């Protein structure tokens, strides 16, 4: 996924009210930008650290710039725009990067499914087979190279695991896809120490045939692209 304009370097001063952050630009001026991540962003926010902004090029927008990348406590770079994960995975599927998800005829987004009235992120289909894919953006690193999801208790994430298990029980292929937007993470696990209920459902889902796939993202100044498979533990 290529940005319309290259990212702009800045210094992160603080994040507040979940959706806002104050940053200092290279000319010394301070502006408020939109933070496109509603999660805890645990281990991602370091005050007075380098960050990168995306310019919407829309002067009428209340917050013209969005916080796209941050520097973590370990010095790694994290892409904190969780909404971009679906697009990254779709592009990687279409470009043949994700070998596990090739061979389908159609790709649909945000289709309604399941008893809990969810929307599947990606639905792949071919004659006599459907593949339901839930995409999760991973940015939490704890320990050297160890990535975890979720970074806070996630009842929504728990619901998605139940829905995937239901699809698998009906004979469909079901996939949980971890899109790792963090340059320091080399392996991913369910965060039992943060959300024990999610971790228990994760183990149950794996035992019932839900596939778990993790890939890392190359976080460039001009765009992002999924590049390599990572280990799930």
Swiss-Prot record:
UniProt cross-references to Pfam families, sorted A to Z: SfsA, SfsA_N
Organism for this UniProt entry: Saccharophagus degradans (strain 2-40 / ATCC 43961 / DSM 17024)
Protein family membership: Belongs to the SfsA family.
InterPro entries, alphabetized: SfsA, SfsA_C, SfsA_N
Any one Gene Ontology molecular-function term assigned to this protein's record: DNA binding
Entry-linked Gene3D superfamilies: 2.40.50.580, 3.40.1350.60
Name of the protein in question: Sugar fermentation stimulation protein homolog
